[in-house]
């Protein structure tokens, strides 16, 4: 699908509600499914990723009833016999969270996916499974695991995706003995680990840090049903936040001030760039201000990478984004994808491994004659949409349907901010 993104006649400005946090929703759905009894999860958006997790929960151990923006999840207290593979679509969270849970089912479980999902590395789990002589088979067609994980000590790198750590956090407390996770420094994305722990605690399962790199997971625990309201998503709010910082006149609602989301770092990053904004409760309002480049550490907030590359083009001076290696292993190689599309618009930037250097060049940006490529990546498409609006460029972007993965209503929600969308 081709989508043309243009500035609306009224220019930039308006109010937008942050969509529900996809990260928190994944976690709440799985905790509810593992509980015995009915949980009610409110403030949901049924993106492809969340729909994949809900579908997997229903296939494994729960009855799921969805409403307009909520879901009732009835944990059955036992695992269902599987008659088909578990389809994770393109959701890395769904797959990596469920692999350890699958070890509790007492049966072989095959996962399938689409896009680049089955190409994404799972070596952390593969090593753990092979150490315990469990079945772990991965190919481009799917991934099959079989056998029960045992309680005990687990050592894994702290600088790989926190999704592996969260997956073990979900499953190990249900085993009969205590377990410890020993994370080899540096520990990145700690905020996502603590988000998992906080959601688990709401459902009655607890863990604690023994020191900066060791987690204790007491065994013999049980998830309990509860009513859970999902926060607004800071990683998605980053798109209108960058637009507001550049152009002013944008208010974002639904952003909890006391959040555990690591992507709340977007506000600190924008403040360091010179952005002018005020917070009132869960709302943040931006005024236009001159922006300058800064040095950004992406270790705890990798999802911000693509839109921060757009921000760098629109700041004065140079922006350096460090510890961005994991961007190469997402739905696309996000560094290469954004470099290619931003250069097509006149952007000046380069990368070396996990370091991206972006040179402010707003005055030389232009709309290329050929369509830009969305690389089947929701964050690439939304970042290019911000560029179109903030730099007043009438861009054409393909693969725009990729937004269905995380924020299906993005274009409609962004319309009041001055982003006009037409099918091309």
Kindly label every feature range from the protein language model.
Residues 1-424:
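Short, structured segments at the rim of ligand-binding sites
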């Amino acid at each position: 699908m081709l989508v043309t993104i243009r500035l609306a006649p009224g220019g930039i400005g308006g109010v937008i509600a942050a969509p529900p946090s996809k990260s928190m929703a994944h976690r709440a759905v799985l905790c509810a499914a593992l509980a015995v009894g009915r949980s009610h999860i409110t403030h949901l958006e049924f993106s492809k990723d969340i729909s994949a997790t809900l579908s997997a929960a229903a296939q494994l151990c729960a009855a799921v009833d969805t409403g307009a923006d909520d879901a009732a999840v009835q944990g059955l207290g036992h695992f269902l016999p599987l008659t088909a593979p578990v389809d994770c679509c393109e959701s890395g969270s769904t797959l990596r969270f469920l692999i350890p849970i699958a070890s509790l089912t007492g049966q072989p479980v095959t996962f399938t996916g689409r896009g680049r999902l089955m190409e994404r590395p799972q070596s952390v789990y593969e090593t753990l499974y092979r150490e315990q002589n469990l079945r772990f088979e991965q190919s481009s067609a799917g991934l099959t695991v079989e056998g029960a994980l045992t309680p005990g000590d687990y050592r894994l790198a702290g600088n790989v995706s926190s999704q592996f750590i969260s997956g073990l956090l979900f499953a190990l407390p249900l085993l009969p003995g205590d377990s410890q996770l020993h994370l080899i420094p540096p520990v990145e994305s700690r905020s996502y680990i603590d988000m998992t722990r906080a959601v688990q605690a709401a459902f009655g399962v607890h863990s604690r840090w023994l020191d900066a790199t060791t987690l204790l997971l007491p065994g013999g625990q049980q998830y309990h049903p509860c009513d859970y309201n999902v926060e607004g998503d800071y990683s998605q709010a980053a798109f209108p936040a960058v637009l507001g910082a550049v152009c002013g006149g944008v208010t974002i609602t639904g952003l909890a001030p006391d959040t555990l989301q690591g992507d709340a770092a977007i506000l600190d990053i924008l403040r360091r760039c010179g952005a002018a904004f005020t917070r009132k409760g869960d709302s943040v309002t931006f005024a236009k201000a001159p922006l300058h480049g800064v040095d950004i550490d992406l270790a705890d907030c990798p999802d911000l990478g693509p839109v921060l590359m757009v921000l760098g083009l629109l700041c004065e001076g140079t922006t350096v984004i460090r510890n961005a290696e994991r961007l190469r292993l997402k739905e696309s190689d996000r560094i290469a994808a954004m470099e290619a599309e931003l250069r097509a618009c006149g952007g000046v930037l380069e990368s070396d491994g996990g370091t991206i250097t972006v040179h402010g060049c707003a005055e030389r940006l232009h709309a290329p004659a050929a369509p830009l490529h969305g690389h089947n990546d929701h964050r690439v498409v939304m970042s290019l949409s911000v560029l179109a609006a903030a730099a007043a460029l009438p861009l054409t972007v393909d693969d725009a349907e990729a937004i269905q993965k995380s924020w299906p209503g993005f274009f409609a929600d962004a319309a009041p901010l001055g982003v006009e969308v037409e099918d091309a």
